[in-house]
Design a protein with these regions (language model features):
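Alpha-helical transmembrane segments
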Residues: 139, 143-149, 174, 200-214, ...
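Small-residue-rich segments of transmembrane alpha-helices in multi-pass membrane proteins
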Residues: 29-31, 91-99, 158-169, 188-194, ...
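Transmembrane alpha-helix boundary signature
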Residues: 41-45, 67-78, 104-116, 172-175, ...
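Signature of multi-pass transmembrane helix bundles
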Residues: 1-69, 84-85, 182, 195, ...
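Transmembrane helix-loop boundary segments of multi-pass membrane transporters
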Residues: 51, 70, 117-129, 146-161, ...
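Hydrophobic alpha-helical transmembrane segments in multi-pass integral membrane proteins
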Residues: 169-177, 228-238, 322-329, 402-403, ...
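Helix-loop-helix junctions within the multi-pass membrane cores of secondary transporters/permeases
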Residues: 83-85, 92-163, 348-429
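C-terminal membrane-solvent junction of multi-pass transporters and transport-like membrane proteins
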Residues: 179-186, 211-220, 429-458
Length: 530
């Protein structure tokens, strides 16, 4: 009885803490939308749509809180357990096979990926399958890197070099989608698992003295694979015949509350039922795989398995509430705001500022971002603060969305951003501690999660559609996720470069303090006697 009471008290206090964190995360986006509504910046933004947005914001806070509690003690725990166990087998083929299966399973089940795939118009199963294969293969490369102590920088140069070689023969219309596919794979299901899997594997190989560095980098490599596999897929598709089909969300068309509430509750029911199935499909394969793997190879105590399953339920229902609320209230509002700004003349500057704000505040609300920055602080033993990384990521993502809006308006190729951006990012990787490079590339993948695909992307699509028409959406609107994924690579490594320079200056000042003028005289005296 006392144990149950203590457990309930712990859950209550943990939930209240996560509730407060989630509220602070979502509040800035609510503030931006509220300012736009009350100032009348968006003409077609009615009170019913605003009220539905507020209701969904409350649901997002609740869902995010439940997910964060559950993910820490379920998906992260499973990833670490399997990661530690795999290396102990000492059989490379077994490690490779299991890693590939895990990579494919967690990817094809990622809800974030399904949201993006539904907006493209390509066969969803084919697209998701190719992305899953890409993630599986490149997680294998990441695991082999840890086992054989290979340099992460060199791997990034080789793989991104291959990406830009394939970009030369990929249809420009499909190129932004290829780059976006690398970002949307790393969402709330994939990231906690892969991060913990890498940490568990790195802990098992800690004798090489690189455990901290090796804990990161898997998510980054997992983001490269889908870019390559989707580029290959595009070579076999009739890309030129693809047309984006715009559809207005019925909930944003109501100017009064007459008939609104029945439509709202009907749509809410459809979204929640849909997410119950989608998230169930997302989490079930990983859970079943863990139970079978544990039964055969680990044989954990029943108490630990039950605890993991209970927390998996928290994560499940939290993710259901989060995604349903985002799709119900956030996506249509973001689309409407973008459409309204694109339809007005002279609003590019406002669109850039609003897009930057959405990116900046949206990344704070990303479930997977909280998982990553907590692990960064843990692995670095507090030397890299989670608050600092979160702040830097938010600034970089805001800048990335602003650049995406500029590209959507002027319509130039995404390669004008990607090529110099990755040259800078890869160049910085040779100037900063390797752990910063691994953290930066992981941050890029994590930042482009469900808030990006369901809030930022619809905003950019709405803006592009209204400004230039449906025919320009594929080539100009898509690519926003790729920009969100790119900017943290530069900014987080820039943070590492700043830390390096600051350390060098401090060391120089210390040496200078101990170097007195009399020392020169003594040296000179000795030389004279010689």
């Amino acid at each position: 009885m006392e144990a149950n009471a203590a457990s309930k008290t712990f859950f209550r206090s943990a939930f209240l803490l996560k509730l407060r964190e989630s509220f602070v995360s979502v509040l800035p986006i609510v503030a931006v939308i509220s300012i736009l509504f009350f100032t009348g910046v968006i003409a077609d933004f009615g009170l019913p749509a605003y009220i539905s947005f507020l209701i969904c914001s409350v649901l997002i806070v609740i869902g995010l809180s439940l997910f964060n509690i559950g993910a820490e003690a379920s998906m992260s725990a499973i990833g670490k357990i399997i990661g530690e166990s795999l290396f102990k087998k000492r059989k490379i083929f077994f490690v490779v096979a299991m890693t590939f299966i895990i990579g494919v399973l967690v990817t094809i089940a990622e809800p974030d990926l399904k949201v993006t795939a539904s907006q493209i118009g390509v066969d969803e199963l084919l697209l998701i399958g190719m992305i899953g294969v890409g993630v599986g293969l490149f997680v294998v490369f990441g695991v082999l890197r840890i086992i054989f102590n290979k340099n992460l920088n060199i791997m990034f140069i080789c793989f991104y070099g291959l990406v830009f070689m394939l970009a030369g023969i990929t249809n420009p219309k499909f190129l932004p989608i290829c780059f976006d596919s690398g970002g949307v794979t790393t969402g709330p299901v994939t990231v906690p698992f892969i991060l913990a899997f890498g940490a568990g594997l790195a802990a098992s190989t800690a004798s090489n003295g690189r455990s901290g560095e090796d804990s990161f980098g898997l998510t980054a490599l997992a983001s490269v694979g889908p870019i390559l596999t989707v580029m290959v897929l595009s070579l076999f598709l009739d890309v030129d015949s693809m047309v984006y089909v715009w559809s207005d969300n019925p909930l944003t068309t109501y100017e009064t509350f007459e008939g609104f509430w029945p439509a709202f509750f009907s749509s809410a029911g459809e979204h929640f039922l849909g997410e119950l199935g989608m998230v169930g499909i997302a989490i079930a394969p990983t859970t079943v795989f863990y139970l079978i793997y544990d039964l055969i190879f680990i044989k954990s105590r029943r108490v630990r398995i039950v605890r993991i399953l209970i927390n998996m339920l928290y994560a499940y229902f939290g993710l259901v509430i989060f995604l349903a609320a985002v799709n119900l209230g956030f996506l249509p509002v973001a689309q409407e705001v973008g459409k309204g700004l694109g339809a007005s003349e002279g609003t590019l500057g406002i669109a850039i500022l609003i897009g930057a704000a959405f990116g900046l505040f949206g990344v704070i609300a990303e479930p997977a971002v909280h998982v990553l920055i907590r692990q960064i602080e843990t692995v670095s033993e507090g030397t890299v603060k989670s608050l600092t990384v979160g702040f830097v990521m938010a600034l970089s993502v805001g800048g990335g969305v602003a650049l995406a809006i500029i590209r959507a308006y002027y319509g130039f190729s995404i390669l004008y951003y990607m090529i110099p951006g990755y040259i800078i990012a890869l160049g910085l990787s040779f100037l900063v501690p390797k752990i910063y490079t691994a953290m930066a590339f992981d941050s890029g993948g994590v930042a482009s999660g469900p808030m990006a695909s369901t809030f930022v992307v619809p905003f950019v699509i709405g803006f592009t559609y209204s400004a230039h028409g449906a025919e320009s959406v594929f080539e100009n609107a898509f690519g926003a996720v790729a920009m969100i994924a790119l900017m943290p690579l530069i900014v987080v490594q820039g943070m590492g470069l700043y830390a390096n320079i600051k350390r060098s200056i401090n060391n120089y000042m210390v040496r200078k303090r101990f170097h007195e003028d009399d020392d020169l005289v003594i040296i000179s005296f000795e030389e004279a006697n010689a």
